[in-house]
Amino acid sequence: MKAAIIGAMEEEVAILRSRMEGCEETVIAGCEFSKGRLDGVEAVLLKSGIGKVNAAMGTTLLLDHFRPDFVINTGSAGGFLPSLRVGDLVISEEVVHHDVDVTAFGYAYGQVPGLPARYRADEALVEAAKQAAARLDGLQAVTGLIATGDSFMNDPKRVEFVRGQFPELCAVEMEAAAIAQVCVQFGTPFVIIRALSDIAGEESGVSFEQFLETAAKHSAELVLSMLSVMKQKRY
């Protein structure tokens, strides 16, 4: 079993890198890869950089150079469900772009022509993430839709527009759909697991800066718990 784990920022990968044994680091086109063993599991950790282009480029390099069995995207997100609070965990069932609009030609909002309207996460990975979350005391986890766009969601009008397009939306962030799109095209199983650093809206920028470290810690804890579950289940 070879795991690939992607985070956009240093804060989102630092804890996992510090836990890696036999870590070998490589930089390709600005993407930082760390290869080793994470709690006994062969793993490659990628710090991709922020945004969809960086995420897509990094994921492509990751899959082409390292050939992992599956991809986990970890990090922070902004919450959309009223029941969610900062620090809560969101596990993807589906992922969608919230800033793609080709509806003039009959496509669903968020759909890239020639590709699915939404990208479904691997069911076995989702189940492993849910079991892993249940082992973490004091953390709420939900499973559902995550949406991606190249903008930070602190504009209330934009928040309401996106909520109108995707009423069931759990969280928003800036890389997941790009990672999912590349994984789908490569035929590589994926799941997105994010911890909330903010609740999308006017004060989200302040909250993000204040709680990024907490969100990164919770998300990393879920990744490690998930790898433990998968090792036991012989994924």
From Swiss-Prot:
Q: Which GO terms describe its cellular component?
A: cytosol
Q: According to the UniProt entry, what is the EC number of this protein?
A: 3.2.2.9
Which CDD domains does the entry mention? MTAN
Record keywords: Hydrolase included? yes
Query: Gene3D superfamilies, per this entry?
Result: Nucleoside phosphorylase domain
- GO biological process terms held by the UniProt record: L-methionine salvage from methylthioadenosine; L-methionine salvage from S-adenosylmethionine; nucleoside catabolic process
Pathway noted in the entry: Amino-acid biosynthesis; L-methionine biosynthesis via salvage pathway; S-methyl-5-thio-alpha-D-ribose 1-phosphate from S-methyl-5'-thioadenosine (hydrolase route): step 1/2
GO molecular function terms noted in the UniProt entry: adenosylhomocysteine nucleosidase activity; methylthioadenosine nucleosidase activity
Q: Which UniProt keywords apply?
A: Amino-acid biosynthesis, Hydrolase, Methionine biosynthesis
Q: What class of enzyme is it?
A: hydrolase
Q: Which SUPFAM superfamilies match?
A: Purine and uridine phosphorylases
Which domain of life, per UniProt?
Bacteria
List the catalytic residues.
E12 (proton acceptor), D198 (proton donor)
What NCBIfam families does the record tag this protein with?
MTA_SAH-Nsdase, PRK05584.1
Which family does the UniProt entry place this protein in?
A: Belongs to the PNP/UDP phosphorylase family. MtnN subfamily.
Recorded protein name is 5'-methylthioadenosine/S-adenosylhomocysteine nucleosidase
Organism this protein belongs to: Geobacillus kaustophilus (strain HTA426)
